[in-house]
From Swiss-Prot:
<comment type="subunit">
    <text>F-type ATPases have 2 components, F(1) - the catalytic core - and F(0) - the membrane proton channel. F(1) has five subunits: alpha(3), beta(3), gamma(1), delta(1), epsilon(1). F(0) has four main subunits: a(1), b(1), b'(1) and c(10-14). The alpha and beta chains form an alternating ring which encloses part of the gamma chain. F(1) is attached to F(0) by a central stalk formed by the gamma and epsilon chains, while a peripheral stalk is formed by the delta, b and b' chains.</text>
</comment>
<comment type="similarity">
    <text>Belongs to the ATPase B chain family.</text>
</comment>
<dbReference type="Pfam" id="PF00430">
    <property type="entry name" value="ATP-synt_B"/>
</dbReference>
<keyword id="KW-0150">Chloroplast</keyword>
<keyword id="KW-1133">Transmembrane helix</keyword>
<keyword id="KW-0066">ATP synthesis</keyword>
<dbReference type="GO" id="GO:0009535">
    <property type="term" value="C:chloroplast thylakoid membrane"/>
</dbReference>
<dbReference type="GO" id="GO:0005524">
    <property type="term" value="F:ATP binding"/>
</dbReference>
<feature type="transmembrane region" description="Helical">
    <location>
        <begin position="25"/>
        <end position="45"/>
    </location>
</feature>
<keyword id="KW-0375">Hydrogen ion transport</keyword>
<keyword id="KW-0472">Membrane</keyword>
<keyword id="KW-0813">Transport</keyword>
<keyword id="KW-0793">Thylakoid</keyword>
<dbReference type="InterPro" id="IPR002146">
    <property type="entry name" value="ATP_synth_b/b'su_bac/chlpt"/>
</dbReference>
<keyword id="KW-0547">Nucleotide-binding</keyword>
<keyword id="KW-0406">Ion transport</keyword>
<keyword id="KW-0812">Transmembrane</keyword>
Length: 183
């Protein structure tokens, strides 16, 4: 209680032209202290965040490269299917009189199968990119949250003295006791 009243007395005797300094009392922080804390967090946190984002970017680029390689393989399969289709068309000219409709069905089946394969690979690539992006964003959020919590705990631990700590514990026990009493 002495620290709290001391803070109010200090505010009552605020000098009109004083020196610049940091206020270490967490209950009496001001805009300058908050700006300094945010600046320090940004200064030290941006390197870690940049590294995380660079790692994620490399993973995503690797996934894109893998997807492109799969796409190239599929295009090669498509080209082989087109060559096969050309052969089938040549055979169709020879057998036109006997089985034109059956050859046409095989042609459509080949085109449909290749088209479905391409669509599935494209869908798979897009889903992989989406999930990698979501995972990267979740990991960055989680690490940012952990850093913020660690910073807040460090600030609280450095600012709490033993007397204030015991008063806070007693007040919380009193609140919990009141809650239990109401039940």
């Amino acid at each position: 209680m002495k620290n709290v009243t001391h803070s109010f007395v200090f505010l009552a005797h605020w000098p009109f032209a004083g020196s610049f300094g940091l206020n270490t009392d967490i209950l009496a922080t001001n805009l300058i202290n908050l700006t300094v804390v945010v600046g320090v967090l940004i200064f030290f946190g941006k390197g870690v965040l940049k590294d995380l984002l660079d790692n994620r970017k490399q993973r995503i680029l690797s996934t894109i490269r893998n997807s492109e390689e799969l796409r190239k393989g599929t295009l090669e399969q498509l080209e082989k299917a087109r060559i096969r289709l050309q052969k089938v068309e040549l055979e169709a000219d020879e057998y036109r009189m006997n089985g034109y409709s059956e050859i046409e069905r095989e042609k459509e089946n080949l085109i449909n199968a290749t088209s479905i394969s391409l669509e599935q690979l494209e869908k798979s690539k897009n889903e992989t990119l989406y999930f990698e992006k979501q995972r990267a964003m979740n990991q960055v959020r989680q690490q940012g949250f952990q850093q913020a919590v660690q910073g807040a705990l460090g600030t609280l631990n450095s600012c709490l003295n033993t007397e204030l700590h015991f008063r806070t514990i007693r007040a919380n026990i009193g609140i919990l006791g009141a809650i239990e009493w109401k039940r």
